[in-house]
């Protein structure tokens, strides 16, 4: 596979800075991609520092093999399994920082053979890991209109989900779709209104990709795993690219950073509350950032990104 696709890492310095790196500590890049964050982390680690990286994309694993550094190790698999991978290395509760850069990467979008983009014709695949699971074409060929509409509405917030789903099923009864441009044209024809600022297939392609890769479930499992993997005082740095991702991250941090949930109106002193309601906070929210106008100008794909930080509290 050609790797001539340019990739500019979004919020590169900010995400790494948010880890509060210590030279001889252990870090985890849960989404290696093409290694922008990993390379910057390695440049700041000392001789005893270690960096583990995870990615389920075989092309990312191939790119990672170009890093010849004894402090670095790449793991092929989903980031949702980070707790399992770190347990195998006796590192549960010992990792000082985790970075997650969610969603699809520019090389994946720009490579027509991956099937993520409606702007370039290619096989209708959309799998992050091309070695397993069903492709988008395979799923669309056997899914009902009701199931397709639910996916488009739930993961793409597509207001014409039912019309588009019915058109897909009707087309596939005649001849199953196998190409991205074919699907994009069908969605455009089925959409009664056009947004001049957005291609009519944008939301549907996002929704199908999220469903095929179980992206939101993967994020939920990864965030839960991060709590187990992080050492006390360890930092979590997460970049999201659309509202569904960011909502999960925001809710997770909020859920684990709230103090004791005490029913309102109880006639208790602070000392009594402390004695009866255990403080179960596991995280401390540590800030939020968005890209600068300059970064958005240089890299328009950064426009929707949000970076959130959290810190694991000592027990």
UniProtKB/Swiss-Prot annotation:
Q: Which gene encodes it?
A: rsmH
Q: Where in the cell is it found?
A: Cytoplasm
Q: Which UniProt keywords apply?
A: Cytoplasm, Methyltransferase, rRNA processing, S-adenosyl-L-methionine, Transferase
- What EC numbers are recorded for this enzyme? 2.1.1.199
Q: Which organism is it from?
A: Sodalis glossinidius (strain morsitans)
A Pfam family cross-referenced in the UniProt record is Methyltransf_5
Q: Which SUPFAM superfamilies match?
A: Putative methyltransferase TM0872, insert domain, S-adenosyl-L-methionine-dependent methyltransferases
Its name, as the record gives it, is: Ribosomal RNA small subunit methyltransferase H
Binding sites annotated in the UniProt record for S-adenosyl-L-methionine: 35-37, 55, 79, 101, 108
| HAMAP family for this protein | 16SrRNA_methyltr_H
- Function (record text): Specifically methylates the N4 position of cytidine in position 1402 (C1402) of 16S rRNA.
Q: Which GO terms describe its biological process?
A: rRNA base methylation
């Amino acid at each position: 596979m050609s790797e001539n696709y340019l990739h500019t890492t979004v919020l590169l310095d900010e995400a790494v800075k948010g880890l509060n790196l210590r030279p001889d500590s252990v870090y985890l890049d849960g989404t290696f991609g093409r290694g922008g964050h990993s390379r910057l982390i390695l440049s700041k680690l000392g001789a005893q520092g270690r960096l583990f990286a995870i990615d389920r994309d075989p092309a990312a694993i191939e790119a990672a093999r170009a890093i010849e550094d004894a402090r670095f190790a790449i793991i092929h698999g989903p980031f949702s399994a980070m707790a399992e991978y770190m347990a195998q290395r006796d590192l549960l509760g010992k990792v000082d920082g985790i970075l997650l850069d969610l969603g699809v990467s520019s090389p994946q979008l720009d490579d027509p053979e991956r099937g993520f983009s409606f702007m370039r014709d290619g096989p209708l695949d959309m799998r992050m890991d091309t070695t397993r699971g069903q492709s988008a074409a395979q799923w669309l060929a056997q899914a009902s209109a009701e199931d397709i509409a639910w996916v488009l509405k739930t993961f793409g917030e597509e207001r014409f989900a039912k019309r588009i789903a019915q058109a897909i099923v009707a087309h596939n009864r005649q001849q199953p779709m196998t190409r991205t441009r074919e699907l994009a044209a069908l969605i455009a024809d089925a959409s009664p209104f056009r947004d001049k600022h957005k291609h009519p297939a944008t939301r549907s392609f996002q929704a199908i990709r999220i469903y095929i890769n179980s992206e939101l479930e993967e994020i939920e499992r990864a965030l839960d795993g991060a709590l187990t993997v992080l050492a006390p005082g360890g930092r979590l740095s997460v970049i999201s690219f659309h509202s569904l991702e960011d909502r999960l991250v925001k809710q997770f941090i909020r859920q684990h950073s709230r103090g004791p949930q005490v029913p309102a109106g109880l006639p208790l002193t602070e000392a009594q509350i402390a004695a009866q309601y255990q403080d179960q906070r596991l995280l401390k929210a540590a800030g939020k950032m968005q890209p600068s106008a300059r970064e958005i100008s240089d890299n328009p794909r950064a426009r929707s990104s949000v970076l959130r930080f959290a810190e694991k509290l000592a027990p």
